[in-house]
């Protein structure tokens, strides 16, 4: 470690680098969303085997390739953050609340796909929340959410780290106000990658939708 550089400073630099990576992933995710929400695995050919004419196939392929490369960089960065975070906690008795809050939003399980605003083919195991109401002209409606959608991943929150408390999602929404939050949504037999931008609008809250725990979670 360079003289005068603390673990906290190194950790903050890595967290900032993580944000920059996620911003690049988001930009490419927007390309996929703009192309009929094709995501990382949607078909690029029509029923007759010809390239789809309702999307920019070249643009989609390039965005997917870029996202895969960025995800690999993201995974390595998350491993570095995990190591430094453990070191930081071991060095001090009282943690810095602001830094811990920022770090707590990270999906630091290295056995899972990287957290944050990601698009991934590895679908989470189960729904964490279900949408039962979407208000007209709300951020949720503009993102493409519909009543009945099961959300499998909400930003960095997935079935592996969700604690069954809606306040966990509320905290993420507040922290990500006016920023892109990537969602993995199951709608019937379809899985969609959507981009939600929490922000103030003419209605209540930052989303304009109501989410509840899925029935199986409430049975536990």
UniProtKB/Swiss-Prot annotation:
Changing residue 187 to A: Abolishes interaction with PI31. Keywords: Chaperone, Coiled coil. The keyword Coiled coil applies. SMART domains: PDZ. Changing residue 121 to A: Does not affect interaction with PI31. Changing residue 185 to T: Does not affect interaction with PI31. GO terms for biological process: proteasome regulatory particle assembly. Residues 102-200 form the PDZ domain. Changing residue 10 to A: Does not affect interaction with PI31. It comes from the Eukaryota. Residues 4-32, 61-91 form a coiled coil. GO terms for cellular component: cytoplasm; nucleus. Changing residue 114 to A: Does not affect interaction with PI31. Pfam families: Nas2_N, PDZ_6. This is 26S proteasome non-ATPase regulatory subunit 9. It comes from Drosophila melanogaster (Fruit fly).
